[in-house]
Every structure is written in structure tokens, then in C-alpha cells.
């Protein structure tokens, strides 16, 4: 075997090993650490816009939250957290909503106003309503209509969360499909790494949203 052939095979082998290691690392990262996510609808406006591409921290809400101390920053989901979770109505989908209540909380929505334990919650910093009409509980309206504006009171079960969209009047969330089991939670948004406004054209990027941290 000539030196050139031997050297060529070594290069091919090194490249193949490097690609394999990179692929394994990418799969590990996506499965356990970070995942890309695209906002498909207006249900989380104004915090997140259609066309926002996010990095999701899949490690922060691990099952062993707090077990490893300050070296591994894991914790439980808190009220106000943005979370991604496996869809309840369609498990093939992954949804992003805001957790508004945790296990043990009594949730009520009265004329669009969120109440926890009977106390009104100030959501003015992030919630918007696109429809001024308020649907009351009624025997003449289907439940899926008035539950948008009138819900509960109901207690969030153990190991569950109550999650709502910020664009409250157009979001399909826990008001309709019920509480979200903590075992379905996938992660929390880290930042917007890219954003594109499709309606404005194929090359209309929202550069100002790059590295934006959603709250």
C-alpha cells in the first residue's frame, strides 16, 4: 500500500469519525438539551410572533429538578413560565403556552379575567384580547364557545399545569383540552435566534428580534 493511499484512507476515516461524533452530539443535544421550535400561530402574541424561531431549553424542567444543587440549574415549572409541551388533542404536535396555574391552584376565568383562589391576577403585561365580546355561560351556546371567557372554578390536579395563550381570545389551550401533565412538558424558550415575516415576503426578516429573550 502506497503512502498516499494510506494517508487518504486515514483522512476519510477521520472525517467519518468526526461526522459520526457530530451526529451523535446533535441527537443528544436535541433529545436532552436544546431544540429548535417555530411559532406557527398568533396565539402567543405579542410575546411571540408567527415566524419566530426559538431555541428551547429541554433540560431546565428535568424530573430531578433541584436534586443536583447549583451545579445543574433545574427547577419546577412556575406560574408565568413559558413552556412547550406535547399536544393533548394531537400528540404529534408540540405547543407553546404560558403556565398560569400549578397543581393545587383553583382556576377561574370570569368575563375573560383570570382568578386564582378567587383573587384576580394582573396579566396586563402580556395578555391581549382581540374580541371585545364576552360570552357568558349559556344553555343556548355550545360549551366550547363560552369556555373562552367563562371557566371554572376548577382545581389543577397533582402533577399538572394550567396553560393559556397570551392572545387569549384566539388561543386553544387548557380551557378546552384541560390541564397539562408535567410529564408532557418539554422545555422553556431560551431566545429567538431568527424571525421571518412571511406575509411581508420571503426575505423580510425581523432582525431586531434576533437574540430576543421571550418573557
Task: Indicate where each model-derived feature is located.
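Alpha-helical transmembrane spans of integral membrane proteins, capturing the lipid-embedded, hydrophobic core
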Residues: 15-19, 23, 27
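Soluble "head" domains of membrane/secretory-pathway proteins
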Residues: 2-13, 28, 32-215
Amino acid at each position: 500500500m502506497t503512502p498516499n493511499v494510506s494517508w487518504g484512507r486515514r483522512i476519510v476515516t477521520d472525517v467519518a469519525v468526526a461526522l459520526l461524533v457530530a451526529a451523535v452530539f446533535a441527537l443528544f443535544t436535541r433529545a436532552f438539551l436544546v431544540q429548535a421550535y417555530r411559532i406557527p400561530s398568533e396565539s402567543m402574541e405579542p410575546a411571540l410572533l408567527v415566524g419566530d424561531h426559538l431555541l428551547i431549553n429541554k433540560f431546565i424542567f428535568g424530573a430531578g429538578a433541584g436534586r443536583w444543587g447549583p451545579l445543574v440549574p433545574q427547577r419546577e415549572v412556575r406560574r408565568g413560565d413559558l413552556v412547550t409541551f406535547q399536544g393533548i388533542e394531537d400528540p404529534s404536535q408540540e405547543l407553546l403556552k404560558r403556565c398560569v396555574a400549578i397543581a393545587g391552584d383553583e382556576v377561574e376565568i370570569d368575563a375573560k379575567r383570570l382568578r386564582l383562589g378567587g383573587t384576580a391576577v394582573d396579566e396586563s403585561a402580556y395578555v391581549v384580547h382581540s374580541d371585545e365580546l364576552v360570552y357568558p355561560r349559556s344553555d343556548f351556546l355550545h360549551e366550547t364557545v363560552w369556555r373562552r371567557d367563562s371557566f371554572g372554578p376548577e382545581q389543577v390536579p397533582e402533577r399538572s399545569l394550567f396553560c393559556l395563550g397570551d392572545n387569549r381570545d384566539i388561543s386553544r389551550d387548557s380551557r378546552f383540552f384541560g390541564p397539562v401533565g408535567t410529564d408532557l412538558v418539554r422545555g422553556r424558550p431560551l431566545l429567538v435566534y431568527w424571525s421571518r415575516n412571511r406575509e411581508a415576503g420571503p426575505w423580510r426578516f425581523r432582525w431586531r428580534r434576533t437574540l430576543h429573550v421571550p418573557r
